[in-house]
Amino acid sequence: MEEQEEKQYNQNIQDNEEGTQMREELQESTSAQQTLQEQEIDYQAKYLELKDQYVRAFADFENTKKRLERDKNQSLEYAYERIMNDLLPVLDTLEKALESAQSNPEAGAIAQGLQLTLEGFLKVLSKHGVEVIATDGEFDPNLHECLMQVPDANKNDGEILQTLQKGFVYKHRVLRPSMVSVVKN
């Protein structure tokens, strides 16, 4: 029986060693699994961080694109405005030439040609957003510049009496105010 006990004892030791080895393998496996789970959590956090950075970078890109488009449009508007301002003295000269030609009876054909040229010029300006400032009615300091005040019993104070030089607006911005005389009783 001793032999049997010894066999049993050896078997128990072997089982114990195998159990210990299995426990160690299980602990290693559990430890490896925990490490993998921690790495997965780290990767998920890194993914979320990178995704957030991407979303922010894309939003910044879109905002920059919109700002550049707006700046480009403003630059074009400013350039158009400067060109329109440069054309106003040419228009003034054309109007004075027309007045001079109309006062000379021998220059009828020239006056007619100047009139057609002036009308065409004004149509082109209008097509591009330039409009003549109206001068009938009340004085508006945003649109008109008063060069003189004149008494007139037939009109109310602040009413425009005479236009001395036409004014123009470009897309609701004053290029040049109308130069007017205003009633002051």
UniProtKB/Swiss-Prot annotation:
UniProt main location, coarse: cytoplasm
Keyword Chaperone: yes
Keyword field: Chaperone, Cytoplasm, Stress response
Start-end of Polar residues biased regions: 28-37
Alphabetical list of Gene3D superfamilies matching this protein: 3.90.20.20, Head domain of nucleotide exchange factor GrpE (2.30.22.10)
Location relative to the cell: Cytoplasm
Family: Belongs to the GrpE family.
Task performed by this protein: Participates actively in the response to hyperosmotic and heat shock by preventing the aggregation of stress-denatured proteins, in association with DnaK and GrpE. It is the nucleotide exchange factor for DnaK and may function as a thermosensor. Unfolded proteins bind initially to DnaJ; upon interaction with the DnaJ-bound protein, DnaK hydrolyzes its bound ATP, resulting in the formation of a stable complex. GrpE releases ADP from DnaK; ATP binding to DnaK triggers the release of the substrate protein, thus completing the reaction cycle.
Name this protein carries in UniProt: Protein GrpE
Gene that specifies this protein: grpE
